[in-house]
């Protein structure tokens, strides 16, 4: 028994897991939000739905988004008219794009993260790949392993259909892997596409327009590991704790269902209110051990699910106007990229902290929170510790 305890102790890291590198990538196709209503109703042959188009214009104007990136080109949509219908039988065409583009964009982000990390890719011991697009076997984790030329013995974990909260999920899983497998280095990739969800408008599904106004494509990658080798590696943030919570009275608030017509997404109007009404519970539980209860004293990396969610969080917690700056910037420049979005926010925060001459990667603050929100309704709460900025 004593030798078993010694073995177990030897397997664990000395310190907490740290984020050692971040990389991001987007498709080449860029859509300016101000022009998108005209494009969307034209490409879907829905210009006769003038009242619905006016509603969509209002959604886009209030979205906080300046531009988005999407893998679907105008040429592809013209060649696949079933994708442009509201409920056209189009799963095969969507899959053909998703199973190729999901690992491809993920690879672009991963290459950037590995380059920043500084170690050879052969030192990657674990891979976590997360997406809500392109379910396939073998999965995107396998495809990425081959594309990057990772060690064939890399321990892979494939996560499908988690949605927007999974940017927090992957950090929670990576933390557990890094801290319980001494010397391990975990490559985390979230790659999300609108290929399954893009569809034309319908007067009978106004909630679908919300997703069409907000969702976008993008991939983010991290390298996570404990006990950094300071001769090569540098921690960007330490992952102090991670937890998950289902919000009360939220059944059916966000749902997604795979059909012959693709992935149909359903959003209830009270989603922002449900999140804001319950956000203080996971916050209090996460920061009680640190004695922190002033939410303006920490840095914020919140999933920018939509402008209403961010606005109501600010009001509920009494946050200063600049607290959600990083989330709003990512929303403006990229839209809602599901699980990868909050990792873009993380990258934005560390970059802006350096540009502005802040003392830490957390905008000069030591402690912070990363929030993922999504179907369930599920909230992932990750407590982060920033590090001093090195010019």
UniProtKB/Swiss-Prot annotation:
<dbReference type="Pfam" id="PF00195">
    <property type="entry name" value="Chal_sti_synt_N"/>
</dbReference>
<feature type="active site">
    <location>
        <position position="164"/>
    </location>
</feature>
<dbReference type="InterPro" id="IPR018088">
    <property type="entry name" value="Chalcone/stilbene_synthase_AS"/>
</dbReference>
<keyword id="KW-0284">Flavonoid biosynthesis</keyword>
<dbReference type="GO" id="GO:0030639">
    <property type="term" value="P:polyketide biosynthetic process"/>
</dbReference>
<dbReference type="InterPro" id="IPR012328">
    <property type="entry name" value="Chalcone/stilbene_synt_C"/>
</dbReference>
<keyword id="KW-0808">Transferase</keyword>
<comment type="subunit">
    <text>Homodimer.</text>
</comment>
<dbReference type="InterPro" id="IPR011141">
    <property type="entry name" value="Polyketide_synthase_type-III"/>
</dbReference>
<dbReference type="InterPro" id="IPR016039">
    <property type="entry name" value="Thiolase-like"/>
</dbReference>
<dbReference type="Pfam" id="PF02797">
    <property type="entry name" value="Chal_sti_synt_C"/>
</dbReference>
<protein>
    <recommendedName>
        <fullName>Acridone synthase 2</fullName>
        <ecNumber>2.3.1.159</ecNumber>
    </recommendedName>
</protein>
<dbReference type="InterPro" id="IPR001099">
    <property type="entry name" value="Chalcone/stilbene_synt_N"/>
</dbReference>
<dbReference type="GO" id="GO:0050635">
    <property type="term" value="F:acridone synthase activity"/>
</dbReference>
<keyword id="KW-0012">Acyltransferase</keyword>
<comment type="similarity">
    <text>Belongs to the thiolase-like superfamily. Chalcone/stilbene synthases family.</text>
</comment>
<dbReference type="GO" id="GO:0009813">
    <property type="term" value="P:flavonoid biosynthetic process"/>
</dbReference>
């Amino acid at each position: 028994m004593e030798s078993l305890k010694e073995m177990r102790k030897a397997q664990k890291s000395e310190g907490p897991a740290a984020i050692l590198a971040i990389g991001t990538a987007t498709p080449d196709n860029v859509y300016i939000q101000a022009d998108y209503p005209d494009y969307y109703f034209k490409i879907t042959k829905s210009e006769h739905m003038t009242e619905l188009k006016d509603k969509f214009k209002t959604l886009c104007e209030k979205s906080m988004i300046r531009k988005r990136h999407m893998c679907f080109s105008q040429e592809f949509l013209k060649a696949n008219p079933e994708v442009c219908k509201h409920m056209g039988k189009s799963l095969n065409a969507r899959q053909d794009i998703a199973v190729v583009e999901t690992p491809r964009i993920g690879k672009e982000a991963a290459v950037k993260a590995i380059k920043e990390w500084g170690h050879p890719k052969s030192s990657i011991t674990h891979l976590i790949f997360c997406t809500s697009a392109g379910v396939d076997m073998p999965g995107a984790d396998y495809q990425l392993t081959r594309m990057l030329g990772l060690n064939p013995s890399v321990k892979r974990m494939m996560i499908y259909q988690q949605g927007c909260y999974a940017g927090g999920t992957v950090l929670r899983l990576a933390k557990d892997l890094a801290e319980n497998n001494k010397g391990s280095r975990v490559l985390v990739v979230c790659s999300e596409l609108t290929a399954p969800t893009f569809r034309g408008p319908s007067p009978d599904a106004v909630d679908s327009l919300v997703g069409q106004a907000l969702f976008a494509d993008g991939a983010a990658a991290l390298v996570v590991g404990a006990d950094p080798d300071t001769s090569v590696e540098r921690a960007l943030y330490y992952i102090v704790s991670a937890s998950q919570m289902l919000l009360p009275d939220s059944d059916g608030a966000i749902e997604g269902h795979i059909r012959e017509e693709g992935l149909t997404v359903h959003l209830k109007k009270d989603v922002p209110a449900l999140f804001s009404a319950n956000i203080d519970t996971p916050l209090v539980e996460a920061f009680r051990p640190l004695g922190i209860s002033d939410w303006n004293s920490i840095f914020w990396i919140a999933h920018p699910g939509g402008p209403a969610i961010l606005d109501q969080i600010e009001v509920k917690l009494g946050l200063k106007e600049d607290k959600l700056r990083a989330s709003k910037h990512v929303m403006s420049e990229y839209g809602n990229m599901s699980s990868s979005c909050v990792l873009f926010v993380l990258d934005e925060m560390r970059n802006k902290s350096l540009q502005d001459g802040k003392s830490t990667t957390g905008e000069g603050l030591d402690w912070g929170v990363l929030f993922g929100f999504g179907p369930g309704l599920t909230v992932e709460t990750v407590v982060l510790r920033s590090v001093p900025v090195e010019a």
